[in-house]
Amino acid sequence: KNRANANKLMGRFLYGLKKKADYAVISLAGGQKDNAITRECTVEFLTDAVEDVNTYAKELQSQIREEYTGSDENITIEVKAEGTVTSQVLHPTSQEKIVFYLQNVPFGIQKMSGTIKGLVETSTNIGILKTSENEVMGSSSIRSSVETARDSLSDKIAYLTEFLGGEYERQGVYPAWEYRKDSPLRDKMVEVYEEMYGQKPNVVAIHAGLECGLFYKKMEGLDCVSLGPDMKDIHTSEEVLSISSTERVWKYLVKVLEALKE
């Protein structure tokens, strides 16, 4: 849906700002979940050029809103001056590396499927950015239906991180699960759906991390299908689940299990 990621926009803001004013970053914070597109990101920094910062923020906000017209056009860059303070700041070299990282770390769709029209094959999202006493940490979620593509993208982020002197840790990896052209289970589920609702279901391949991949990896040749209720604004802070749809899915699943028992 061409949603903007606040962590990536922060990299753009800080990179552009250094051309307008001197500043020293105290801390960065954005996002709570690595698989949710970050809606807010905050930076604290010291500067003597408050007016220049305000002017630049307004200019960049206007540019970004224009770029995201129709998809995420209410983006806001808010500047608050807190007065004179004394604080620890990042070393200039560390600050430069972090801005470089945010500007260059991959985000969004990296490759579309070559076999299924309109399906995203590989994507990534930098969903968390936070500062502790002696480090700045970024966390990205990588998804792909092709394991080698997933690993290649992971390597790219690792290389960027390590090149800048950081450490990269890979965790929570789940297996890719490729679309199966012939699926008796899927055929049975379509049959049950038609019997219940008098119409064909819309069977699609989606770009998501699912438990099916874990079972598929452990059980060679497993035929599996994922189903679920209607959801909107998935992987954003506005994500919602339809309760009435959940009830329908439950009743449908019961019927599918009964049909498989026959």
Model regions and ranges:
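Catalytic cores of large soluble enzymes that bind and process phosphate-bearing ligands
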Residues: N2-N5, A49, L90, G114, ...
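C-terminal structural cap/anchor segments
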Residues: T131-K188
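Short coil/turn connectors at secondary-structure junctions
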Residues: K19-D22, L164, E220-D223
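C-terminal non-catalytic regions of proteins with extracellular/luminal or membrane-system context
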Residues: E167-P175, P184-V203, K251, E258-E262
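Zn-dependent metallopeptidase/amidohydrolase metal-coordination segment
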Residues: G114, E121-M137, S141, V190-K255
